[in-house]
Amino acid sequence: FLDHMLESFSKHSLIDLEIKCVGDTHIDDHHSVEDVGIVLGSLLNQAIYPAKGIERFGSANIVMDEACVECDLDLSNRPFLYHSLSVSGKVGQFDTELVEEFFRAFILNAGISAHIVQKRGSNKHHIIEAAFKSVAVAIRRATVKNDRIGIPSTKDVL
């Protein structure tokens, strides 16, 4: 399931991904999911900052059938995550509690301030996929090149 979410993230963020994760999945998927988030976030951080010539802010509302999830983010290099995804149990063999673990690891290591808000939805798969897509599209919009901006901060540093 995480592979499917990462493929969706890659497609909608326009960030090419090739990930191979070998972990202690004989215990559970927690460490592997968290580690993928840490590495992906760290690499995005290296690619973005000092964030010169990009928009910096991004938002996206993504609808997937009955589910609607909004992501608003700031490439501020001041990490913060708020989320209100209402999912529990499993999607297939994937523990839905790991969605928060992934986003927390990814967002904090990327240096992003993000609010991921479920506006509606009842199908866990749809809610989670809409969340991944909303983060992806918001990142794509925040990283649009704009050479007129310079460093997108009045402090001239991020």
Predicted regions and their residues:
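N-terminal intrinsically disordered, cationic/polar leader segments
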Residues: 1-158
